[in-house]
């Protein structure tokens, strides 16, 4: 670790030698963070040390305005669009109006527990609690209810799904889960109980279910190093100095190995047959390229909101593009258009189809067009509906 004269941590060098840096202002507030790859995020503050803006690794800035109680009142995104937030007298968030005018509301009881949530489509979910503030039920917009039971220590002892299926839980004196039992809607046992055992450090050392018993071993850092299944065969786990999983070793001696970049992103995977898959990432740690052992490559593009906009698959042996998928989104982040083009095996013709979606206020597609058949392309429009 490195420090400034005010004893703020200014640099961290991990066991692999990678360095992350932090810059502070005269009031010891973080103003800039730089990761091991040199990517930066910066922050500004008001006179009350509240964050007023965040500029991310892409250079996009999000701004924040506050009310008299210090609650975030306005959020301004990178395009200048604003979302407005409202609160009750206890500073509970009660209303969010997004940049498109969509309204989400929240309701609370006298204990400040959330009891209603109404989304922008005017669909409401209801919540109830016991006197200790434990969540006892959730009723979704379709009227389906799931319930929760607790013991005197506030530990979850039962969960009943809307279908009537129930799972019960039993604990030891240290609050470790000892047993899970299952019942169907008629109250009859539906699956064999699952039991657990722990060591003095609270680490789970065994589990017994309908498939048999499995045992677990750990290293000094609490990382699992070995799993022994009911067949008495061991699977071992190896880690690098940055705590990333480096290898899984199987009873027959084969293994899966993993390699990572400075930001702990997976960059190479070698499977049990020694076939290699490699991965590339952008500055935001998003996967941008996957190359498989046969040379087949997948390239992925994103927009500023992290939506996938394009996927291109390329043949490893011939180098030709074998499929392309493009996506368009509306301002609410829902897919409104999909274009897919694939190379047809054997004939080398390229059938294409394009799907366009019209989302209603409840995010259900409302329009459907005719299917038009052409000599080389098939163009269709699909419609989808979603439950609550």
Model-derived features: where do they sit?
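Beta-strand elements of repeat-based all-beta scaffolds
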Residues: 1-14, 18-35, 39-56, 60-77, ...
């Amino acid at each position: 670790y490195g420090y400034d004269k005010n004893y703020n941590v200014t640099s961290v060098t991990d066991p692999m030698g990678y360095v992350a840096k932090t810059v502070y202002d005269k009031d010891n507030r973080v103003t800039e963070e730089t990761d091991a790859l040199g990517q930066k995020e910066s922050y500004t503050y008001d006179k009350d040390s509240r964050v007023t803006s965040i500029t991310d690794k892409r250079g996009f800035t999000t701004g924040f305005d506050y009310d008299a109680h210090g609650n975030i009142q306005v959020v301004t995104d990178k395009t200048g669009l604003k979302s407005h937030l409202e609160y009750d007298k206890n500073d509970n968030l009660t209303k969010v109006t997004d940049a498109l005018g969509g309204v989400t509301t929240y309701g609370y009881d006298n204990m400040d527990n959330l009891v209603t949530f109404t989304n922008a489509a005017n669909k409401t979910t209801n919540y109830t609690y016991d006197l200790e503030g434990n969540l006892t039920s959730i009723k979704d917009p379709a009227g389906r209810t799931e319930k929760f039971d607790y013991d005197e220590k506030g530990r979850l002892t039962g969960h009943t799904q809307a279908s009537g299926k129930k799972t019960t839980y039993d604990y030891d004196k240290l609050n470790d889960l000892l047993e899970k039992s299952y019942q169907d809607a008629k109250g009859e046992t539906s699956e064999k109980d699952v039991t657990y055992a722990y060591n003095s450090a609270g680490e789970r050392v065994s589990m017994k279910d309908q498939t048999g018993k499995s045992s677990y071993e750990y290293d000094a850092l609490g990382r699992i190093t070995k799993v022994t299944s009911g067949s008495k065969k061991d699977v071992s786990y190896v880690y690098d100095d940055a705590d990333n999983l480096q290898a899984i070793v199987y009873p027959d001696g084969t293994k899966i190995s993993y390699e990572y970049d400075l930001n702990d992103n997976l960059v190479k995977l070698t499977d049990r047959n020694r076939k290699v898959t490699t991965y590339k990432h952008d500055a935001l740690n998003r996967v941008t390229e996957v190359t498989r052992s046969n040379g087949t490559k997948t390239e992925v593009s994103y927009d500023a909101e992290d939506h996938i906009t394009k996927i291109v698959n390329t043949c490893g042996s011939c180098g030709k593009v074998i499929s392309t998928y493009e996506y368009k989104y509306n301002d609410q982040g829902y897919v409104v258009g999909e274009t897919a083009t694939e190379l047809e095996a054997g004939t080398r013709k390229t059938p294409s189809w394009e799907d366009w979606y019209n989302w209603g206020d409840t995010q259900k597609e409302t329009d459907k067009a005719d299917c038009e058949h052409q000599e080389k392309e098939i163009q269709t429009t699909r419609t989808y509906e979603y439950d609550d």
